[in-house]
Each structure stands twice: as structure tokens, then as C-alpha cells.
């Protein structure tokens, strides 16, 4: 029998709730659903009503998502319906109360004068969601979102290289280090959190796409709880749990070896520069208009001046000069403009500091603080401590 029409596992679930909270929860869970599910039921969201309210769940054996919302439960029970269809419907409804109930082998959804009847799927075929590991620590939700966003930008997208598609999460007591790389750039963020145990030590690799989605749209509220386990069991479940403010998700950890990244970070620079982020970003986008997609933008640094240039005679040339604080020998270096603006957008500060060694070796970008004083002399210059670095490989200069 077709899974969409079977009545097995249906209940008399009936509830009423406000559209806004329902739409937010369904949309969040639906984003975790696979676009091409291995079996049809994995495209569904499970709605479960109890005396405590309504729980909306999704799971594809890799990623799970669960959200709890307040609802008037007239009749408890569970039902499974298409997640993306339900999400599209509730987001388009007017801001009025929603009445939802099981009607035979279908569900009815009414809101204002709008009425929908949707087919159901077999609840008994739906997998059980994994249990969250023990809590490992907590941190503010806004800090979590910022830090993940800063490193996820550098993660690889090639699934044939799984070690590059993840974010390395290293935990040592109250310190967390996040790192990601696609071989062309490396982003590292260090932050402080509230560890469940002061002597906890762990290092895991988490899928960057899932973690970025959770950080970007997932947990609202004051704190996020990360669950990898506790004591000697940290990471042993092969799961990372993220929870807070009525939402929780899990993702399987990647079983791959992340590159040894610390040895890539230079301890000193032969030249350094500090410049306004917004002005530099705007100038890069402007001169890159004459460059083919992915072509280089050249940066010529000298005392007090930066000249940006791109293009060639056959496609057109562009140049722009900017003021810069620069110390060291004059330097010409070139970068992929997209990777460069990604890094500038991730430093989250008004000014950015560049550290260079040679035109053929990676440049280091970090936030420039108000306390940074322009260096003097000809170098070398020691790399200053920072909680965020973006290491970017240059591209080969012509000739």
C-alpha cells in the first residue's frame, strides 16, 4: 500500500495554535530534510501533540531537528506529513490562528477562510530520533552564530574530500577553537565558553553545512547548549547535539582527519598593512568588474598607499588607489577577489590587518583593534595575538 495513503499509525491529533510560531518551527525543521530522501517518509515532518504542547520533528539518519511550540491540544497523537509542503503552506497563511486535525487518512488545516487537506505518511515507518549526548558546555547564541559564520566560509564543498567539508571543533576546558579550510583559505576562531567540566578535552569534525545552518537559523535565545558527551565519553556517540529555546538538533560527526592547521599560521611577517574594511571591500568589487569570474585582483602595497588593479588589455583594466598603514618592503600580491572579500566580511571589525611573508605565500587577515598602532621599521614583525585569523593563498602573478 502507498505510504502516503495508509491509515496505519494515524491518531486523532487535533490542535490550535498561532501561525507565527508554527511557521517558524515547521520551516526550521523542514530545512534539515533531504532534497532526495532515500525513502519517502524521510521527507516528512512528525507532528506529536501531548499535554505539554506540540513537537515538530525531522530526521534523515544523518541530521535530526526538533522544535517545541505552545499549542492548544484538543486531542493528543502523532501524524506524519510532507515537510516542505507544510512549510510552504504555513508561511503563506495569514496571521490568524490555525486549526489542524486528522481526518481519516488525511489532515485538515484551516486558517481564516483558507482550508487545506493533505495526505499523510506512515508514522510507524518513521525512524526514532537520536537521544542528545550529555551536555558538554554552553555559550551565548549570538557568539555561537558569529563564530560558526566566521569559519564556515572557508570550509570545502567537495564531498569527495570529507575532511575539508567539516569544521574542526577543539575543546580544552573553557576554550573552544573552531577551524575550517578548503585548501585555498583557512579560518580559525578561538572563543571562551562555559564548559560542563573544567578539565574536558575533545576534538571532533562536524559537517560545516549542518553547523552553519544551525547557527544561522536555528537557536534563538540567550544560550546554546552543545552536547558531545561528558568525561571520557566525549565524542564517543559520534553525534553533536545543539539545543536551546525549545529547539534541538543532532548531526553525525565526520570520520576523517582534519589537516594540521596550526603549523600553517606564520609567527612573523615581513610586511604588514592595516586598512578600512568597507573601503577596501567596495574597491575590490569595483575593480573586479573587469576581471573574469575567479580572476585575480592585484594589490600593490607601498608606504601609505595601496593600488588595486584587475583585468587585461583584451577585457579592460581597472585601478583604484587607497590610503593604508603599511610597514615593510613594498609588495605586490594577487588574490581571488571572492575569497578576499569573504575574508574581509568575516573579520567583523572596522579595520583589517594583513600580514605578509612573500607574494607566493599565504597572507594572514585579522581584525585590527583600536589599540593597534602602525608598525615602524622594515620588519620582521611578530604576529599579534588575535581570536580570529583568515589565512588566504595568493594566486600567481603574471610572469
UniProtKB/Swiss-Prot annotation:
SMART domains: POL3Bc (SM00480). Disulfide bonds: none annotated. CDD domains: beta_clamp. Transmembrane segments: none annotated. It is found in: Cytoplasm. Belongs to the beta sliding clamp family. Confers DNA tethering and processivity to DNA polymerases and other proteins. Acts as a clamp, forming a ring around DNA (a reaction catalyzed by the clamp-loading complex) which diffuses in an ATP-independent manner freely and bidirectionally along dsDNA. Initially characterized for its ability to contact the catalytic subunit of DNA polymerase III (Pol III), a complex, multichain enzyme responsible for most of the replicative synthesis in bacteria; Pol III exhibits 3'-5' exonuclease proofreading activity. This is Beta sliding clamp. The gene is dnaN.
